[in-house]
């Protein structure tokens, strides 16, 4: 299983979220990200305001801009914040010594669990219109969102290939393919 793309994504997420800063700054950043997540869910990206996020976070509007260059960048970091634990869990699944079919089950379970625990990411995966417009603003040639989604697809395809080895009957292949892609 090629887990290097996943490791690279996780490293990128950690670098984006946690630049070298003190404990107080990291706590403040975490608080802002948590509040912004709730505001984006409640109001949508377009209607969420930096002022509301600042007030609910207990910081000034200017402080928000010390951590994030724009509302769009804040959204990307909120998505990264929601993704960090998910990618760590995926790495653990890939490193496990269980059979490929069990790995696929665990991967799919984590995806369902992630959608339940991270509704903002679920909106991204569902190609929610508000989310797509917001991400177009921030993804200025960096391909952050594209890389995230491609990594998930790459992992899923690798797991499916491992499960559908040449020893697997055509009927079983169809069954697994239908579970994954339908």
Feature roles, as predicted:
Residues 34, 101-119, 174-178:
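Amphipathic alpha-helical segments that line or abut small-molecule/effector binding pockets
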Residues 36, 58-68:
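Short hydrophobic/aromatic patch on the recognition helix
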Residues 46, 60, 69-71, 99:
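Short coil/turn motifs that cap or connect alpha-helices
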Residues 42-46, 97, 118:
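Short coil/turn segments at alpha/beta junctions that flank glycine-rich nucleotide-binding fingerprints
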Residues 1-43, 47-56, 73:
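Basic, helix-initiating cap at the start of DNA-binding domains
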Residues 106, 115-140:
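Amphipathic alpha-helical segments used for helix-helix packing
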Residues 84, 132-165, 171-178:
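Amphipathic alpha-helical packing segments from all-alpha helical-bundle domains
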Residues 27-38, 42, 56, 73-96, ...:
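Alpha-helical structural segments
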């Amino acid at each position: 299983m090629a887990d290097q793309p996943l490791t690279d994504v996780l490293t990128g997420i950690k670098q984006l979220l946690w630049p070298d800063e003190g404990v107080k700054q990291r706590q403040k950043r975490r608080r802002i990200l948590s509040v912004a997540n709730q505001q984006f869910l409640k109001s949508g990206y377009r209607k969420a305001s930096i002022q509301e996020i600042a007030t609910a976070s207990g910081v000034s509007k200017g402080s928000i801009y010390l951590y994030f260059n724009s509302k769009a960048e804040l959204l990307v970091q909120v998505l990264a914040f929601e993704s960090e634990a998910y990618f760590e869990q995926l790495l653990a699944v890939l490193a496990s010594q269980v059979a490929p079919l069990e790995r696929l089950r665990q991967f799919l379970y984590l995806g369902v669990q992630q959608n339940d625990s991270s509704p903002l990411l679920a909106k991204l995966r569902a190609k929610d219109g508000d989310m797509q417009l917001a991400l177009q603003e921030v993804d200025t040639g960096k391909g952050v969102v594209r890389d995230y989604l491609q990594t998930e697809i790459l992992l899923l395809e690798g797991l499916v290939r491992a499960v559908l080895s040449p020893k697997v009957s055509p009927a079983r292949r169809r069954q697994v393919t239908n579970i994954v892609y339908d």
